[in-house]
Amino acid sequence: MASEKDAGKQSAVKLVPLLITVAVGLIIWFIPAPSGLEPKAWHLFAIFVATIIGFISKPLPMGAIAIFALAVTALTGTLSIEDTLSGFGNKTIWLIVIAFFISRGFIKTGLGARISYVFVQKFGKKTLGLSYSLLFSDLILSPAIPSNTARAGGIIFPIIRSLSETFGSSPANGTERKIGAFLLKTGFQGNLITSAMFLTAMAANPLIAKLAHDVAGVDLTWTSWAIAAIVPGLVSLIITPLVIYKLYPPEIKETPDAAKIATEKLKEMGPFKKSELSMVIVFLLVLVLWIFGGSFNIDATTTALIGLAVLLLSQVLTWDDIKKEQGAWDTLTWFAALVMLANFLNELGMVSWFSNAMKSSVSGFSWIVAFIILIVVYYYSHYFFASATAHISAMYSAFLAVVVAAGAPPLLAALSLAFISNLFGSTTHYGSGAAPVFFGAGYIPQGKWWSIGFILSIVHIIVWLVIGGLWWKVLGIW
């Protein structure tokens, strides 16, 4: 009986956040539409804002909030039921969902862990070297695992936790600073960088690509994204552990046993399994098609479908695995709602209206100054978001429109905001899916997490806008 009551409490609606969400939506709804904007666009904006607030305050799970938003959109006649459900037929959504399924193969077969242990075995003799081995393990995995939460939480975090405890570093006995705190903070921050480096390294990156095309007419392909990100990304991966090593140094500087631990783990895993070989083949197939498929008119979502079909055919994944992948189905629901809302806000003129309104506010500045101001505002506004996807859905289109309207080259603006959309999770312990996993281990106090995150945010902005800017100049992006 007690357990049933506890379960009921856990699943209960949070009344105060729900009332706030509904109240904000109603207030915006009944405010007269601004001049130059259709009432229908304003009403959809009210639903959109309420949805974002619901995602942040979480009176219900995100999927449930999305269903509520869909119901209100259709019931009020703001959009037809066909338009309301149009997001579920979006190929970008299905690329994300299918990629979730493929990432399950890395975890289920143990291939992801094996790759990481090999890196530790080769490069993990010192604590700093160990941190680099973990980051570059993440880098290798990132193009094929679009859920940075699955990549960091399902592969990198367990390895760090195991290594930390092996070296006697645990918050339970007050030894978290030995090695665990440093590795966890470095692993988390590195995950954000690798997420920024590839179109397929974070679930919302394909959404960004779609918004960039819809708003600015920019096509962000897998290859163009990776080439633009490679230099600032690698520089960030090199600098970040050094900064954390200086700000929050580990007590253990040498880790001669790390390679031995990795070797033992690899022995426990045994020889390369048939399922792992199948996973490698699919990984390479998908990666090659994501890079070169455009030359053969093979869409990225088609590539993902091919990869999933092969995994099912080879029984690396079963249909039960697919059904049990709750994160994928949850993502399908709330991503579909967000994409639909964002699409029709653009179609109904909301984004262009906001762009024109904001353009006047930065009209006195050169495009470079306006560009920097808007990038910084976009980055630090993430303190108010508990989800990168929610932030991207709420602000990416509008900020891109304003930056382009101010005179910035569209490709430069789209890419810069895209990269920042991954990096801004560095600031808090709730700003990305992986953050609660790493912070929740208890190795790093909140104040230290935030202070290091803020310093690293400055480092990220400098690296990506200055070093990245020079690289993009070489590439002819601006």
UniProtKB/Swiss-Prot annotation:
The chain crosses the membrane at residues 12-31, 41-57, 64-81, 96-118, 187-209, 222-244, 277-296, 300-319, 332-354, 364-386, 398-420, 450-472. One of its GO terms (molecular function) is transmembrane transporter activity. Signal peptide: none annotated. Belongs to the SLC13A/DASS transporter (TC 2.A.47) family. DIT1 subfamily. Induction: Expression is induced by the two-component regulatory system MalK/MalR in response to malate. The regulator MalR binds to the promoter region of yflS. Pfam families: Na_sulph_symp. The gene is yflS. GO terms for cellular component: plasma membrane. It is a multi-pass membrane protein. This is Putative malate transporter YflS. Might be a malate transporter. The keyword Ligase does not apply. It comes from Bacillus subtilis (strain 168). Keywords: Cell membrane, Membrane, Transmembrane, Transmembrane helix, Transport.
